């Protein structure tokens, strides 16, 4: 999986003291991992717990077995969704699949929601309330709202420049929202 490298050897140092592991360079076949390989990666990541305050695994969208394994192994989940109906449906589908897993105990996991590309603060709250009400009604669970990230043209500009938005334009609406959510 890691081409015979340790997890510590494939860590890259990013700006502002944020380290990362790129799925593109050293991790082979990330989308085609079996159960044993995923558990190997989760164990390797757990070795890093003493080195970092937070370890974030960006699984991407969907309810694939790989996504579900990583999510189920987490003690905190941040679900990022958008106001589009398909995104809200996909978010609920992931949560429903998660709640059905025998290895998932909702009392031991904090699930938080960020509304991304929301038109306004109110729009972000509406998105959260839709998902949370369905989770409460059908899964007997509840979610925590972290906040919203407004739709912001600066995000696309930073992506095109391959820059971190908070460095590219720290005064942009989205960057200020990131900072607020991080608090």
PLM regions and their residue ranges:
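Amphipathic alpha-helical transducer elements in NTP-driven molecular machines
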Residues: 4, 8, 38, 42, ...
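Conserved catalytic-core segment of NTP-binding enzymes
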Residues: 50, 54, 59-147
